[in-house]
């Protein structure tokens, strides 16, 4: 059981104090496009990405309190104001706090691969989730997935072309091991230093489906 560390940061939100769905225009004080990172870890990816896109508002969620604390500290240290951090379980948070059709982008980097065959049904990104998250992406919204686990990357790459309402932005490739302009987290860099390959997948929503 994780130890809950109090987080005193202007960038940390209590999901129970948000509406259903949340009024993100009020939260950020503007109506800029909204993007979501699921599993922000220590916040290095979202911090760099937010700096690159100052006119986009980012929500960074993580189930682990320690990661949320480190992410908030990083944002404060670098003066990044277009990110808000929430400790939450992904699916529940999305259903309760995100309006359908409102997300300009979703980023999922190196989620738990659940490597044992009997546990693979626990993986976050599967066909059911991809159908689910499409409802929350805006038309032309981007879906990014990255993993260092070969089986996970190959599995997602294999089923994504059959998912209605998405276009492959890396075609004719179904995945790539490098993605120009996409920031690497500390964990990605560690995996690559160990000789592992990162699988990058990028799709965009279409009017179909």
UniProtKB/Swiss-Prot annotation:
Pathway: tRNA modification; N(7)-methylguanine-tRNA biosynthesis
Alphabetically ordered keywords of this record: Methyltransferase, S-adenosyl-L-methionine, Transferase, tRNA processing
Coiled coil residues, start to end: none
PROSITE patterns assigned: SAM_MT_TRMB
Reactions that this protein is recorded to catalyse: guanosine(46) in tRNA + S-adenosyl-L-methionine = N(7)-methylguanosine(46) in tRNA + S-adenosyl-L-homocysteine
EC number: 2.1.1.33
Stored SUPFAM superfamilies: S-adenosyl-L-methionine-dependent methyltransferases
Chain positions recorded as S-adenosyl-L-methionine binding sites: 37, 62, 89, 112
GO BP terms, alphabetized: RNA (guanine-N7)-methylation; tRNA methylation
Disulfide bonds: none
Single annotated GO MF: tRNA (guanine(46)-N7)-methyltransferase activity
InterPro entries, A to Z: SAM-dependent_MTases_sf, tRNA_(Gua-N-7)_MeTrfase_Trmb, tRNA_methyltr_TrmB_bact
Ligand binding (substrate): 116, 148
GO cellular component: tRNA methyltransferase complex
Location of the active site: 112
PANTHER family: 3-DEOXY-D-MANNO-OCTULOSONIC-ACID TRANSFERASE/TRNA GUANINE-N 7 - -METHYLTRANSFERASE (PTHR23417), PENTACOTRIPEPTIDE-REPEAT REGION OF PRORP DOMAIN-CONTAINING PROTEIN (PTHR23417:SF14)
Purpose of the protein: Catalyzes the formation of N(7)-methylguanine at position 46 (m7G46) in tRNA.
Family assignment from sequence similarity: Belongs to the class I-like SAM-binding methyltransferase superfamily. TrmB family.
Protein's UniProt name: tRNA (guanine-N(7)-)-methyltransferase
Source organism per UniProt: Geobacter sulfurreducens (strain ATCC 51573 / DSM 12127 / PCA)
Lineage of origin: Bacteria, Pseudomonadati, Thermodesulfobacteriota, Desulfuromonadia, Geobacterales
Gene label: trmB
């Amino acid at each position: 059981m994780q130890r809950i560390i109090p987080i005193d940061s202007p960038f940390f939100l209590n999901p129970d104090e948000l509406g259903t769905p949340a009024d993100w225009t009020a939260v950020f004080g503007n109506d800029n496009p909204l993007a979501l990172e699921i599993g922000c870890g220590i916040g290095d990816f979202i911090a760099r990405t937010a700096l690159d896109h100052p006119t986009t508002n980012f929500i960074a969620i993580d189930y682990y309190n320690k990661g949320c604390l480190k992410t908030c500290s990083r944002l404060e240290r670098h003066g990044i104001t277009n990110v808000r951090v929430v400790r939450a379980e992904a699916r529940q948070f999305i259903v309760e706090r995100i309006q359908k059709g409102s997300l300009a982008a979703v980023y999922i980097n190196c989620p738990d691969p659940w490597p044992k065959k009997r546990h693979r049904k626990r993986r976050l990104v599967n066909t059911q989730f991809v159908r689910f998250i499409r409802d929350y992406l805006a038309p032309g919204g981007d879906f990014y997935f990255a993993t260092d686990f070969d089986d996970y990357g190959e599995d997602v790459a294999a089923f994504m072309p059959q998912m209605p309402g998405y276009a492959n932005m890396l075609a004719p490739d179904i995945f790539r091991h490098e993605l120009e302009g996409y920031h690497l987290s500390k964990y990605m860099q560690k995996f690559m230093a160990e000789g592992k390959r990162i699988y990058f997948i990028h799709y965009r929503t279409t009017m179909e489906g």
